[in-house]
Amino acid sequence: MAGGAHRADRATGEERKEGGGRWRAPHSPSPPGPRGCPVPLKAAAQSLCRKPTWGRYCTLLLFQRKLEIYSVELHAATDIKKKEGRDGKKDNDLELKRNQQKEELKKELDLDDHKLSNKELETKYGTDIIRGLSSTRAAELLAQNGPNALTPPKQTPEIIKFLKQMVGGFSILLWVGAVLCWIAFGIQYVSNPSASLDRVYLGTVLAVVVILTGIFAYYQEAKSTNIMASFCKMIPQQAVVIRDSEKKVIPAEQLVVGDIVEIKGGDQIPADIRLLSAQGCKVDNSSLTGESEPQSRSSGFTHENPLETKNITFYSTTCLEGTATGMVINTGDRTIIGRIASLASGVGNEKTPIAIEIEHFVHIVAGVAVSVGILFFIIAVCMKYHVLDAIIFLIAIIVANVPEGLLATVTVALSLTAKRVAKKNCLVKNLEAVETLGSTSIICSDKTGTLTQNRMTVAHLWFDNQIFVADTSEDNLNQGFDQSSGTWTSLSKIIALCNRAEFKPGEESVPIMKRVVVGDASETALLKFSEVILGDVMEIRKRNHKVVEIPFNSTNKFQLSIHQTEDPNDKRFLLVMKGAPERILEKCSTIMINGKEQPLDKSMAQAFHTAYMELGGLGERVLGFCHFYLPADEFPETYSFDSESMNFPTSNLCFVGLLSMIDPPRSTVPDAVTKCRSAGIKVIMVTGDHPITAKAIAKSVGIISANSETVEDIAKRCNIAVEQVNKRDAKAAVVTGMELKDMSPEQLDELLANYPEIVFARTSPQQKLIIVEGCQRQDAVVAVTGDGVNDSPALKKADIGVAMGITGSDAAKNAADMILLDDNFSSIVTGVEEGRLIFDNLKKTIAYTLTKNIAELCPFLIYIILGLPLPIGTITLLFIDLGTDIIPSIALAYEKAESDIMNRKPRHKKKDRLVNQQLAVYSYLHIGLMQALGAFLVYFTVYAQQGFRPTSLFHLRIAWDSDHLNDLEDNYGQEWTSYQRQYLEWTGYTAFFVGIMVQQIADLIIRKTRKNSIFKQGLFRNKVIWVGIASQIIVALLLSYGLGSITALNFTMLKAQYWFVAVPHAILIWVYDEMRKLFIRLYPGSWWDKNMYY
C-alpha cells in the first residue's frame, strides 16, 4: 500500500516543473536515440576475458527514472599494463590504442527478459516452468558458467606486502649503506685480519633499524582490503529450486540460469530472477539503490526499463513479505550486484594525500642525502682519502641526512590520532585516512541513513482543513498538534487499525522508536506514531476485532479493513481505508471537519488538493485516510464479508485527513553542515531518491541554504521560463541522474565549479563515480559517505570513504577508509578537525626532526674538508634519530590546535605541502645551523679541556687516526697514545651528542606552535611533551653512564659540566623563534610572514 502511495506522489511530483529545482546544462544533447547494437552479456564478458591486460572495471547504470534507458551499461576503464615505448610517438600510439580499446568495450547489454512471455523464456533458457531444469542440464550449465558466486580479486601475498615495507621509503638507502659497510669490512679484512669491527657494527645496526621499522610499519598498516568478501557474505546459503519436477533445497551457489526458484518473506534473493508469479511480494532494495521504501513485485511487465519493471528481482536484495516463483536469468558475476562488486574492486586504491606528502618528503630528503653523499665521496677521493674510507663517509652523510625514525613516528602519530577519533565514534581502517579527512574540501554524502535517520517518520497531518507539524526527532515524544478535535480521534483510530505492522514479541521494555517491527517502512512509521500518542496499539486492535481485510496492491492503490467496534452499544462495523490520496478522495462523498461530517464540495476538494500539493512539494510521502460506519440493518453481526467479491460499500465514504511521512534528517546534521561550510568544505548530496525529496532534505539540513535558489526557483519567482534565467544568478542546483548522463565532463566541471550548493538525485553507482572523479578534477580532496552496496564503488574511488557502522552494508564498510560507529554525519566534523590537527602536528614533527640533520651532517663535512678528529660517529647519530628523538616526536602528536583550525580553508593538496620551502629553510638554515654551532661549542670545549685548542685540531686528522703514532703532543706538550686519542674521540662523540640533545629540548618546545606564542599556547597543556623531554635526558644519561663501557657504541662517561655548555644556545633558539612568531603576528601578509611561516 505505502509503495503505491509513494508512486502516486512521485508521479504528481514529476509533473510539477518547479518541484525538482533541476539544473539543465547549457547545450545539453537531446535524449539518446535507439540503443546501439546489443550484445549478449556472455559475449561482453568474453570480450573482457579476451583482453587479459585489462582489469575489469564494470560499471552499472542503475535505476534511471526515464523511459530512454533500457539497458545496463558495461564499461572498461582501468589501465592497460603494457611495456611502454621508448619514444614519445610510441607512447602516443599506445595511449591511442588504449582509448580505442576502451571505446570497443563500451557495449550495452540487452536485457529483455522482462518483456518475454513465459513460453519465450522457456525457449530462451531451455527450461520448463512447471518441471524446471533436469539435473543433468543444470550440471552442464554449472560447469559451463561457473558457480553462482562472486569471483574474489587476486590478493597481494603477505610476504610481498612485508618486503615492500622492507625496501620502501628511506629503507633502500639504509640497506645499500649496510651492504657497503659489510663489503668494505670484507675488503679490509682480506688485507688485515685484525681490522676493526666498527664497519660490521655499523652495517648490522643499519640492517636492524630497517628490519624493526619495517616490521612496525607492516604491523601498523596491515588491513583487510578484500571487497569481494563482503559481497560473498551477502549471498544466501540455500535456495529452493524445482528440478526434475521436484522441489529441492540446494546451496545458492549451485543455481544456474534457467532454474525455477521459490522465494518467500525473509529470504535474500539468490540470483537475478524474472518473476513468473507473485503473491503480495515486496522487496527491500535499499542496500542496492539507497531507497528505503519497499518495492512491490509482480509477474507483469510494467516498465520498459528492466531495472524499473516489477517482474525482476535482484541478487542479494531481501524479500520482505509475500511469496514468489521465478526463473534465474543471471548468476554470480553476471548479476547486477556482481557488476557493482567488480566495479568496487576495479577501482584502484588511490594514494591518500598524506601518502603523497610523505612520498614527496622522502624524495626530497633522499635526493639531498644521496647528492651530498656522492659529492663529498668525490671530494674525499680527490683529497687522497682511501676509497673504503670515502665509502664510509658516503654512508655517514646519508645516515646524517635520513631521519630513520621519522616514518615510524608518523605512523605512531597517525595511530594515536586514530585511537583518539575512535573514542569519538570514528573507526579508522586506514591510518592515513585521518589526515585525508582533515584535508577534505568536498564531501559527497548519501542521503538515506547518512543525513537522514533511515526510517520513515510521520512529518505532517492535514485534518480540519489545517496542516499540523508532527515531531520528527529521534524519540517522537513532543507531538504538539491539536489532539482534542473529534476529527483527530477518528483519524488516529484509522491509523491504528488500518495497519498490518506489528511489534516483534518481547520488545515491550525497549523505547518505542527503537522497537523492531515486522512490516514495511511506512506501516512501521504509522505504528510507532500511533503507539507514542495512543498507547498500546495491539490492545486497541484487540478491542476492535478485524473481520476482513484487503491488503494494498498496485491496482487498487488502497488498503481496507473492516472491524467490530469496541463500543458495546454500537453494533455497527467500522470500515477503514488508507492509500493514494487522490484514490481515497474519489471514494468519498463527505469530509469530516471538527468531528462532524459535511458534504465534500468543490471548495473542500480544492483545499484537499492544495494541502496535497504542498506536502508533496516538500518531498514527503502522502497518504489519505477515510472511514465509514456500515449500517447495522444491512450488515448485522452475522454478516459474512467476502474480500474477493467485496460485498460491502467502497464509495460514498467519509474523508478524514491526510498524513505525510519522510525519512527525516538527523538532528545533529544541520549543525555539522554549518561547521563544514565555515571550514570551507562543500557538502554535496548524492542520492538515488527523488529530486523533490532530495531537495527538501537538502534545504532542511542546510546543504541548500535558506536564501539560495535554483534556476527553477528563480523562474517560478519571476514568472518566466527556465530558459530565460541567467544560470549565474542561481547558487544551488538539483541535478537528476538522467541530466547527468547527458552531460559532458566539461559540463560537469562547469557545474561543480559554478554552484556552491549541489544536489544529485536519481543517481546510479556509475554516476556516483563520475561525480567523485569530477570533483577530483577540480583538485579537490573528496570524501564520500554512504551505507549501501550501491555506495561502495564511490567509497573506494574517493580520497576517503566514510561508511556507516550501524546501518552500513559489509561492502560499504570494507570499501571505506573510515567507519562512523554512531552513523552520525556530525562525527565527520570531529574527524575533519582531528585530521587538520594531525597535519599541523606532522609539520611540527618533521620540522623538529629535520632541524638536527644539519648538526649531524656538519661534523662529517668538517672532518673531510678541514681534517678535524671526527666530532660524532655514525652509530651515535642513530641513537639520536632512534633513541632520544622518537618519544618527543610522538609527543607533538598530542599538541592541541593553536588556533581555530575549523575556520581555515582546506589545504590545497598541490600547493600546501607538508614539507614546503619555508619549513626546510627555517629548519636547516636557521635553527639547524644554530644547533650545529652549539654542538661544536661542546665538542671544542671537551678537546680544549684535555689540551687541544680548536685551532690545533684543524688538519690533525691524518696524525690523529694513525694507529702507529703513540706520542702525539697536545698544546700543553702532553703525549697521547692511539688508544687515548680514540677514547677522547669517543668522549667528543658523547659531548656532541649531548649538545644536540640539549638543543633539541628547546627545539621541541618551540615546535609546539607555528604562529602563536608558547606562553599563549601554554607550556604545560601538553604533558606528553615533558615526558618526551624526560625521555631525552634519561636516554642520554643511560648511554653515557650506563652503556659507556660498551666499545661498539662509542660512548663514554661525560663530566657533568659538559652537559650545560649548550644551554645558552638552547635559550637563544627559544628567543629567536619567539621573535619570529611575534613578527608573523604583527605583520600578516608581509615578506616576513610569507617566508618565515612554515
Swiss-Prot record:
Residues 179-201, 379-390, 863-872, 937-988, 1042-1056 are lumenal. InterPro entries: ATPase_P-typ_cation-transptr_C (IPR006068), ATPase_P-typ_cation-transptr_N (IPR004014), ATPase_P-typ_cyto_dom_N (IPR023299), ATPase_P-typ_P_site (IPR018303), ATPase_P-typ_TM_dom_sf (IPR023298), ATPase_P-typ_transduc_dom_A_sf (IPR008250), Cation_transp_ATPase_P-type (IPR050510), HAD-like_sf (IPR036412). Gene3D superfamilies: Calcium-transporting ATPase, cytoplasmic domain N (3.40.1110.10), Calcium-transporting ATPase, cytoplasmic transduction domain A (2.70.150.10), Calcium-transporting ATPase, transmembrane domain (1.20.1110.10), HAD superfamily/HAD-like (3.40.50.1000). Mg(2+) binds at D787, D791. The modification Phosphoserine is found at S1013. Residues 1-21 have a biased composition (Basic and acidic residues). Residues 28-37 have a biased composition (Pro residues). It is found in: Apical cell membrane. Residues 1-37, 286-305 are annotated as: Disordered. Keywords: ATP-binding, Cell membrane, Hydrogen ion transport, Ion transport, Magnesium, Membrane, Metal-binding, Nucleotide-binding, Phosphoprotein, Potassium, Potassium transport, Sodium, Sodium transport, Translocase, Transmembrane, Transmembrane helix, Transport. Found in the skin, kidney, distal colon and brain. In the kidney it is found in the connecting tubule, cortical collecting duct and outer medullary collecting duct while in the brain it is specific to choroid plexus and cortex. GO terms for molecular function: ATP binding; ATP hydrolysis activity; metal ion binding; P-type potassium:proton transporter activity; P-type sodium:potassium-exchanging transporter activity. It is an enzyme of class 7 (translocase). It catalyses: K(+)(out) + ATP + H2O + H(+)(in) = K(+)(in) + ADP + phosphate + 2 H(+)(out); K(+)(out) + Na(+)(in) + ATP + H2O = K(+)(in) + Na(+)(out) + ADP + phosphate + H(+). GO terms for biological process: intracellular potassium ion homeostasis; intracellular sodium ion homeostasis; potassium ion import across plasma membrane; sodium ion export across plasma membrane. The X(+)/K(+) ATPase pump is composed of a catalytic alpha subunit and an auxiliary non-catalytic beta subunit. The alpha subunit pairs with the beta subunit of gastric H(+)/K(+) ATPase ATP4B or the beta subunit of Na(+)/K(+) ATPases ATP1B1 and ATP1B3; this interaction is required for the formation of a functionally active pump and its targeting at the plasma membrane. This is Potassium-transporting ATPase alpha chain 2. It comes from Oryctolagus cuniculus.
